[in-house]
UniProtKB/Swiss-Prot annotation:
The lineage of its organism: Bacteria, Pseudomonadati, Pseudomonadota, Alphaproteobacteria, Hyphomicrobiales. It catalyses: (Z)-3-aminoacrylate + H2O + H(+) = 3-oxopropanoate + NH4(+). GO terms for molecular function: deaminase activity. HAMAP family: RutC. This is 3-aminoacrylate deaminase RutC.
Length: 130
């Protein structure tokens, strides 16, 4: 089955050759999302909670552009720069998934933008049951 590229209105230019999301057979794959503005500048420097909110709002835009909602997210891949930010990231994250939580993992690593503190990639099931 062919894939559909998902690019929400107002999306900035990606840092590399990728798109914000692809939808194939009812499954949406959201690219790793950094806390960037439309010009690819890091926003909310030094504030992991605010960066997490920005990232999740961006992901929400991709999911909604594909016809879904945050409740459709089944898996999140979370990359954080420093474990010291784990609590702040989780506090904001929990507000986006108040009911049943998606599966996820979280690892500490370097990120492509030095001022970025968090990056999240998501998988959502949108459409008919698989």
């Amino acid at each position: 089955m062919p894939k559909t590229v998902v690019i929400p209105p107002g999306t900035g230019k990606p840092l590399a050759p990728y798109v914000p999301g692809t939808l194939a057979d009812g499954v949406l794959y959201v690219s790793g999302t950094l806390p960037l503005d439309a010009e690819a500048n890091v926003v909310h420097e030094g504030d992991a909670g605010a960066q997490t909110r920005h990232v999740l709002e961006t992901i929400k835009g991709v999911v909604e552009a594909a016809g879904g909602s945050m409740d459709d997210i089944t898996f999140n891949h979370i990359f954080l720069k420093d474990w010291a930010d784990y609590g702040a990231i989780n506090a904001v994250y929990a507000t986006y998934f108040p009911g049943e939580k998606p599966a996820r993992y979280c690892i500490q690593c370097g990120l492509v933008k030095p001022a970025a503190l968090v990056e999240i990639a998501s998988v959502a099931h949108i459409g008919k049951p698989v």
